[in-house]
Amino acid sequence: MKLNELYNNIGAKKNKKRVARGIGSGKGKTAGRGVKGQKSRAGVAIKGFEGGQTPMIKRLPKRGFNCISSKKYNVINIYNIEAAIAEERLNANDVITKEKLIEIGLINKSNKKLVKLLSICSDDFNYPLSFKLDSYSSKAKEIVEKAGGKLL
């Protein structure tokens, strides 16, 4: 037996059914789509259409609303700032602003979103940094001021 003499067992590999290749193929003419109508045409069916019955999306009640006055925040944790200082992407003497955080890639550029400083997993923060951000959590304020930093 040689590599060029190897072959699959009979019936192990089925050929794909080729549609619209003559009446004798069994899938010719209408290619298994039936006769006329929306589903026989290109583009198939309308998504979400359930054959005339009230669709599920209409049967469920409406919930909630979008508050126009709500503020959307980019959140940044103190431990992210600590890591950036350790990696020397951020200078400990600089005032930390939204522009600076965008520049080093800690937050995404978005003019509409405000920046909020949080304090998750950062009880041992010891850099006397100055921050000029839009908002601070009460714990973050406490940690920064305890380390000798300023909130501008």
Swiss-Prot record:
Family: Belongs to the universal ribosomal protein uL15 family.
Protein's gene: rplO
Keyword Zinc: no
Presence of keyword Transmembrane helix: no
Region (Disordered): 18-37
Alphabetized UniProt keyword annotations: Ribonucleoprotein, Ribosomal protein, RNA-binding, rRNA-binding
A Pfam match: Ribosomal_L27A
Gene Ontology CC: large ribosomal subunit
Protein species of origin: Rickettsia bellii (strain OSU 85-389)
Gly residues: bias regions: 23-35
Name of the molecule in the record: Large ribosomal subunit protein uL15
Classification of source organism: Bacteria, Pseudomonadati, Pseudomonadota, Alphaproteobacteria, Rickettsiales
